[in-house]
Curated annotation (Swiss-Prot):
Gene Ontology process terms (BP): symbiont-mediated suppression of host innate immune response; symbiont-mediated suppression of host JAK-STAT cascade via inhibition of STAT1 activity; symbiont-mediated suppression of host JAK-STAT cascade via inhibition of STAT2 activity; symbiont-mediated suppression of host type I interferon-mediated signaling pathway
InterPro entries noted in UniProt: Paramyxo_C (IPR002608)
Keywords per UniProt: Host-virus interaction, Inhibition of host innate immune response by virus, Inhibition of host interferon signaling pathway by virus, Inhibition of host STAT1 by virus, Inhibition of host STAT2 by virus, Interferon antiviral system evasion, Viral immunoevasion
Polar residues: compositionally biased ranges: 18-34, 42-66
Source organism superkingdom: Viruses
Family: Belongs to the respirovirus protein C family.
Official protein name in the record: Protein C
Region annotation (Disordered) ranges: 15-70
Amino acid sequence: MLKTIKSWILGKRDQETSHLTSHRPSTSLNSYSAPTPKRTRQTAMKSTQGTRDSARQSTNLNPKQQKQAKKIVDQLTKIDSLGHHTNVPQRQRIEMLIRRLYREEIGEEAAQIVELRLWSLEESPEAAQILTMEPKSRKVLITMKLERWIRTLLRGKCDNLKMFQSRYQEVMPFLQQNKMETVMMEEAWNLSVHLIQDIPA
C-alpha cells in the first residue's frame, strides 16, 4: 500500500514539475551553461512512463488513501508554488540559481556554511535534529530549505532591494521563534540578493 502511494506521489510530482518547466526558455547565469546529458533525457522518458503507470495505480487507492496521498503531494509541491513571478527574466535567473544550488559547488559551500552555523546554535531542537541526520540526507534537506527561502524572499514582483527587504520584514515574527530557520534564511539572502542588485535601474 505504501509503495503504491509513494509511486502515485512521485508520478504526480513529476507531472507538476514538467508542467512548470515545459515552457521555460533557456537562459544563463554568469558563465554557467550545461547541455542536457543523454542520461538525463533517458531519465525524463522513464519519468513520463512512470507518471502514466502511477496514474493507473492511483485508481486502486480508496478515497481515504487518495486524500492522504494528495495531502502529501501538496506539501511536496509547496516549494514550486512559491516560484511564480510576474517578471519572466527574474524568474529565469532564480531558476538558474536554484539549479546551481543543487548541482554545483555553490550548493556544497552553502550547505557547509549552514551546517557550521547550526553547530553553534545552543538549545535548538530543530538544529540538533538536522545535525543528527546522515550527511547526504542533511545536505539535501538544507538545500531544499535554502530553495524555499530563496523563493519566499523573491516571490511575486520583487525587482528591487527595497521590496526584497520588505519580504524579510514579513517573516521576522516567524524567525524570532526559530533560530534554525533564521540561519537558513540568512544564507538564502546571501545567495540571492545579487539577483536584485544586478537588475538594471
